[in-house]
Design a protein with these regions (language model features):
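Extracytoplasmic/periplasmic substrate-recognition and gating elements
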Residues: 27, 208, 212-219, 248-310, ...
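C-terminal capping/gating helix-and-loop segments adjacent to ligand/active sites or protein-protein/ligand interfaces
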Residues: 101, 309, 330-383
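Glycine-centered hinge/linker elements that transmit conformational signals in sensory
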Residues: 150-152, 191-222
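Extracytoplasmic "Venus flytrap"/periplasmic binding protein-like
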Residues: 20, 24-91, 108, 127-128, ...
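Short, solvent-exposed loop/beta-turn-alpha elements that line the ligand-binding surface or hinge
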Residues: 78-92, 135-139, 162-166, 186-205, ...
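Extracytoplasmic/periplasmic solute-binding protein
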Residues: 101-111, 116, 126, 143-195, ...
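Hinge/lid segment of periplasmic solute-binding proteins
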Residues: 62-117, 145-146, 255-257, 323-326, ...
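Mature extracytoplasmic/periplasmic domains
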Residues: 227, 242-245, 275-353
Length: 388
């Protein structure tokens, strides 16, 4: 199975689940988890598929779901999961599995439906004499404006090298900024994927806000600046709640809150990771059986300590709290349960790989201090819409 996590706690958990499967399947000698770099995961996986050397199973980003399903490279898992002993197929929620279905088939299992959230370093806020995001949230004042203001202030006070950072964005993965622009009421394209929304007034407002946060306020690191919240480089970071695992051994006080409100109100965003079985695998049948084992009700409880499951019975703070010692029930309710209930997916498109590269290239003109935001976004649409 190809994965994009190198986290030891994740891999140890996967290997324990695999060992149980091997014990009950004498013809299976080994289950291996191949870590591919996050930044070029899909490219590396595609090379394996095109080269006739596919993995048996692989993780798939939600943004690439329509492409993989339309390409016909994934095995329909519905019958295998329905017939697996003690699986509880009907427990899978329609909302979580919708992206991975076509007709009556289920072509990947969304093992993680993980809301984006804002982690913060409470020690840095205390040093700067600022209210924490939790205090702002509870006062009804948790907004993108507050993020920008407090991000600039915590840097000005010398309490943090950087204010806030949209993790994994790095001025390359532009679609991660959906965590911001959804709060402005912006959409990257129409619901049928045929019309570009990148030049709409709401998107211009969102990108103007972000551009000013980077180049005027210096609240967010600029191009070429690396900032990792988890090693103390920033006071806040936008990332998925599953990243809480990276805080297990941290030496600073931290908290986590939902994404802030924008001019369009409260708009939460979720990301999904799914596991698919590849048709071209010589072990596709047993790979599907392993997937059924890995994601049965019992193992879903185990996975839930890092990856919010698509199971109705497990999506409540009390159950999630049993395997999430790092997060309080209140945090789980606010960020995970409510986020999954109300959140929308980050951008997906049947032609996403081409659009991702095209839009990234056009947005390069945005990342200078004197950029014409509206003109850049119009150019994005001029180039991207014909590809939709």
């Amino acid at each position: 199975m190809t994965v994009w996590t190198g986290n030891d706690a994740h891999l140890d958990m996967f290997n324990e689940i695999a060992d149980d499967f091997i014990a009950d399947h004498p013809t299976v000698e080994e289950v291996t988890f191949e870590v591919l770099p996050f930044d070029n995961y899909i490219e590396a996986l595609t090379v394996q598929l095109a080269g006739g050397n596919p993995p048996d199973l692989g993780w798939i980003f939600e943004r690439n779901a329509p492409e993989f399903i339309e390409a016909g490279v994934l095995t329909d898992l519905a019958q295998t999961l329905e017939e697996a002993e003690d699986y509880g197929y009907d427990d899978l929620t329609d909302a979580a599995t919708e992206l991975w279905r076509e007709d009556d088939g289920l072509y990947a299992y969304p093992f993680s439906t993980s809301p984006f959230s804002m982690f913060y370093n409470a020690d840095m806020f205390e040093e700067a004499g600022l209210e924490t995001p939790t205090e702002l949230y509870e006062a009804g004042e948790w907004t993108w404006d507050a993020v920008r203001e407090s991000g600039a202030q915590v840097v000005a006070e010398g309490a943090a090298p950087h204010g806030f950072v949209v993790r994994d964005f790095e001025f390359q993965l532009w679609d991660n900024l959906a965590t911001l622009w959804r709060g402005f009421g912006a959409e990257e394209w129409s619901s049928d994927g045929t019309q570009c929304g990148m030049a709409a007034p709401e998107m211009v407002e969102a990108f103007t806000f972000f551009h000013e946060a980077v180049f005027e306020d210096e609240a967010h690191p600029g191009p070429g600046q690396s900032a990792d919240f988890f090693v103390g480089d920033s006071a806040m970071t936008v990332t998925q709640i599953s990243r809480a695992a990276d805080l297990e051994d941290e030496q600073f006080n931290w908290g986590v809150v939902p994404l802030p409100e924008g001019p369009a109100g409260d708009h939460q965003v979720v990301g999904q990771g799914a596991i698919g079985v590849f048709n071209a695998s010589p072990n596709a049948e047993v790979a599907a059986e392993f997937l059924a084992h890995m994601t049965n009700e019992e193992n879903s409880r185990t996975l839930a300590q890092f990856f919010p499951p698509p199971r109705e019975s497990l999506l409540n703070a009390e159950v999630l709290g049993e395997t999430n010692p790092l997060l309080s029930e209140e945090q789980l309710e606010r960020v995970v349960v409510d986020g999954i209930a109300t959140g929308t997916s980050i951008p997906t498109h049947v032609n996403f790989s081409v659009l991702q590269d095209t839009i990234r290239a056009e947005l390069d003109a945005m990342w200078t201090d004197d950029a014409d935001v509206e003109a850049v976004l119009q150019q994005v649409c001029d180039v991207a819409e014909p590809l939709m």
